[in-house]
C-alpha cells in the first residue's frame, strides 16, 4: 500500500481550483458567490475543510457548470490517481469516527493536499494526453 493518501475532499478542492483558474475567477469572487468568506473558501479548496453537498452544488452554480460535470471531473481524477498507484485515495478519517479512534493514527499514512496534490494531478493529466 502507498504511504501517501489523498482524501476525496482534497481532490474536489483541486478540481474546483483548476476550474476556477481556467475560468479566470478569483477565490474571493467565488467565495462571495457561494456566501462564504474568502478564508473559509480557501480551506475548502486546499482540502483543509470538507465540502458539504450543498456547498458542492453552490460551487458548481458559481462556476457556471452543472453539478454532475463537477462530480464527473472528481471521479475521473480519482480514477486516474488510483491507476497511477502513486497515492491511495480514501475518505479522510474524522476525529470523532470510530475507525479513527481505534486506529489511533498509527497506520494512517500521510495525507497530501494543496499544492502537492495539484502538482500530482497536473502531472497525471499531462501523461494522459
Predicted feature descriptions by range:
Residues 35, 54-69:
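DNA major-groove recognition helix of helix-turn-helix/homeodomain DNA-binding modules
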Residues 24-43:
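Short alpha-helical DNA-recognition segment
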Residues 72-108:
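Short, charged recognition helix plus adjacent turn
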Residues 1-22:
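A short, Lys/Arg-rich alpha-helix, primarily the initiator
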Residues 15, 26, 52-55, 66:
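Residues that mark the N-terminal boundary/hinge immediately upstream of a DNA-recognition element
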Residues 103-127:
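Hydrophobic alpha-helical topogenic segments used for membrane insertion/localization
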Residues 20, 31, 60:
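The alpha-helix within a helix-turn-helix
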Amino acid at each position: 500500500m502507498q504511504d501517501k493518501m489523498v482524501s476525496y475532499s482534497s481532490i474536489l478542492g483541486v478540481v474546483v481550483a483548476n476550474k476556477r483558474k481556467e475560468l479566470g475567477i478569483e477565490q474571493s469572487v467565488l467565495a462571495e458567490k457561494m456566501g462564504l468568506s474568502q478564508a473559509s473558501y480557501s480551506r475548502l479548496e486546499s482540502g483543509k475543510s470538507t465540502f458539504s453537498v450543498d456547498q458542492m452544488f453552490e460551487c458548481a452554480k458559481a462556476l457556471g457548470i452543472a453539478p454532475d460535470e463537477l462530480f464527473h471531473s472528481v471521479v475521473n481524477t480519482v480514477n486516474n490517481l488510483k491507476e497511477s498507484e502513486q497515492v491511495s485515495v480514501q475518505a479522510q478519517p474524522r476525529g470523532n469516527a470510530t475507525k479513527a479512534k481505534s486506529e489511533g493514527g498509527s497506520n494512517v499514512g500521510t495525507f497530501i493536499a494543496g499544492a502537492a496534490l495539484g502538482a500530482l494531478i497536473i502531472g497525471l493529466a499531462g501523461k494522459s494526453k
